């Protein structure tokens, strides 16, 4: 079967709706829900797909589609394919590093008395098809921390050589724990706690946010219900 190009014959170059169809088909190929595209691609079409994936932080996922299409004879230009592959390999390496950092961070926090659950990006990897997990665009680390019911004993500054501890419970325990981490790292910073999270010291350049509320709703009634659900199910995570 001859493959026609979007740029000439099958779809109009100026038809944005049809281009969006191409982009969605391309992602379906990456996810394994489609074998090929409705139409063939010219070089300009491949460049558009690359630019689309770059804008949407889907470079790694998109390269999986490039590999699958290559296997059925729909070939991306060599120069662009090599550029795409290099970026995908960087993403794989970064994901591997973040997975290690998440494991290290969770282990340390749990040793200190906090139950943890990795949220958002790295926490969502299990929802991706296995072949795409390592190619998801990584970001920072978001970790939900839940203190023990009897609270945490946090070292506080006293102005002398003696170490004193104060017992904090609930949200205050998580906030003071994050602030203690900055003191232990020798960082002169008082992180500001907002409604649902507080910054923690970065790990080798990776930013870390400690959440004491996984998420929130802007509706007061729905938010109260959501927070109650989180509280009731926190230790199931």
Task: Identify what each model region corresponds to.
Residues 2-139, 145-237:
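Conserved NTP-donor binding/palm subdomain of two-metal-ion nucleotidyltransferases/polymerases, i.e.
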């Amino acid at each position: 079967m001859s493959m026609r190009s979007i740029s000439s014959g099958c779809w109009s170059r100026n038809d944005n709706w049809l281009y969006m169809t191409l982009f969605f088909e391309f992602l379906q190929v990456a996810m394994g829900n489609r074998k090929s595209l409705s139409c063939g691609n010219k070089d300009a079409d491949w460049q558009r797909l690359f630019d689309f994936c770059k804008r949407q932080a889907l470079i790694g996922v998109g390269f999986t589609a490039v590999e699958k299409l290559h296997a059925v004879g729909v070939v991306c230009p060599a120069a662009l394919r090599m550029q795409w592959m290099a970026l995908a390999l960087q993403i794989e390496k970064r994901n591997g590093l973040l997975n290690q950092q998440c494991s290290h961070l969770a282990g340390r926090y749990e040793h200190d008395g906090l139950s943890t659950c990795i949220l958002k990006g790295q926490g969502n990897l299990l929802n991706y098809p296995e072949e795409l997990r390592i190619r998801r665009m990584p970001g920072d680390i978001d970790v939900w921390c839940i203190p023990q019911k009897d609270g945490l004993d946090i070292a506080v500054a006293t102005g002398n050589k003696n170490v004193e501890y104060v017992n904090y419970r609930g949200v205050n325990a998580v906030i003071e724990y994050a602030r203690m981490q900055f003191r232990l790292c020798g960082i002169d910073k008082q992180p500001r706690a907002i409604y649902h999270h507080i910054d923690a010291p970065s790990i080798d350049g990776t930013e870390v946010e400690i959440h004491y509320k996984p998420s929130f709703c802007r509706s007061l009634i729905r938010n109260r219900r959501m927070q109650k659900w989180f509280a009731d199910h926190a230790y199931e995570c």
